[in-house]
Amino acid sequence: MPTLSFWVCSATPVSPGFFALILLVFVTSIASNVVKIILIHIDSRLHTPMYFLLSQLSLRDILYISTIVPKMLVDQVMSQRAISFAGCTAQHFLYLTLAGAEFFLLGLMSCDRYVAICNPLHYPDLMSRKICWLIVAAAWLGGSIDGFLLTPVTMQFPFCASREINHFFCEVPALLKLSCTDTSAYETAMYVCCIMMLLIPFSVISGSYTRILITVYRMSEAEGRRKAVATCSSHMVVVSLFYGAAMYTYVLPHSYHTPEQDKAVSAFYTILTPMLNPLIYSLRNKDVTGALQKVVGRCVSSGKVTTF
């Protein structure tokens, strides 16, 4: 089976400081997302459609960062930079599936905010448990279609050029540069596919938030307006970070960015974004911070009783 070797940001091993930074980001991302899932599960105040969808977003972030970072860290420790063809295919498929699922989930989450703010009286019926699970299933289905469509085609190209992927994981643009055949037709098809993958959820987000802004503008109570803006602003920040980086990589023509810039942007939305998401959603959310304080208080009280 062919073996593909890859670089991690450069042809030389990364410094211990950079390795420690990536490890810290990875551990922080896993821990913060796990804590958020646990809080949403154990605190009855967080048993709402919005927090259920946030827990699903955290689950995807855990899987997303775990697809790439552990392999990169192990390679640094073992001083090896090789990945098998099967391993590269699996990483490629999981990356596309999870990224696509996150695109669709972020888009559908805006519908939840639209219903909560614009149709609050019908919110329990329109965002029932069944509807929430359908949203989750639709996001997974959309991501899986992306993975199943693009992965077989990408990996069937003959890699008869250099075996070194100028990237830190098996991302599509970096893999296509290794092919010795003409991939222009496929790149055009992939470009159209990516446009649709981004445009459909983004259109849903734009439509939802346009209606939300109109509703917020018409609100007479300042407190209700402030709460609505605070609830939606966190989601918009996450959408801007994730969609912005993805559009730069897959929509902007390759002539406008270098491989080094591609690696930097990819590191941002594959490594940093999963860590930032729970922080962005939690730091400004009184319900989540209140639930965390409640759990910490219980742990401290339990420790004092045990010690006594």
Swiss-Prot record:
Protein name, per record: Olfactory receptor 2T7
Principal place of residence: membrane
UniProt KW Isomerase keyword: no
Protein family membership: Belongs to the G-protein coupled receptor 1 family.
Originating organism: Homo sapiens
Taxonomic placement: Eukaryota, Metazoa, Chordata, Craniata, Vertebrata
Pfam name, any one: 7tm_4
Keyword annotations: Cell membrane, Disulfide bond, G-protein coupled receptor, Membrane, Olfaction, Receptor, Sensory transduction, Transducer, Transmembrane, Transmembrane helix
Entries under InterPro entries matching the protein: GPCR_Rhodpsn, GPCR_Rhodpsn_7TM, Olfact_rcpt
This protein's GO CC annotations: plasma membrane
GO MF term list: G protein-coupled receptor activity; olfactory receptor activity
Stretches assigned to the Cytoplasmic side: 41-51, 110-130, 210-235, 284-308
Superkingdom: Eukaryota
GO terms, biological process: detection of chemical stimulus involved in sensory perception of smell
Ranges of the Extracellular topological domain: 1-17, 75-88, 152-188, 257-262
Residues passing through the membrane, by range: 18-40, 52-74, 89-109, 131-151, 189-209, 236-256, 263-283
Topology relative to the membrane: Multi-pass membrane protein
Record-annotated disulphide pairs: C88-C170
